[in-house]
Amino acid sequence: MSNEGYDVTVFESMPKAGGWLRYGIPEYRLPKDILDKEIELMCRNGMQVETNKKLGVDFTLSQLSEDYDAVCLAVGASQAVEMNYSGSDLDGCYLGVDYLKDYVTEQNYVTAKKLP
């Protein structure tokens, strides 16, 4: 849209822009420097990115409607859905979405050594 002359502001809830391209795809599959260059190109064309901004926490849909001529919500799949199966409650068993995000950000999850 910014290529067509529209002012575009993207509100990203995470510390860096990119959504699941950044937080859900491991570095070896999608190098983050390539993603950063793509985002930088979009910003050069006029797109603005505001990070650490959560809908319903930092702003409301009503506020967006008042402040902007048009609003497009592209809410990602940031919450994992639990699947109750035998063993899913064991220590070291993580939901995939949570594990991928943690791997890229905090790296708090403990993983076991490789089994023989």
What do the predicted segments below correspond to?
Residues M1-P116:
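Residues forming the flavin
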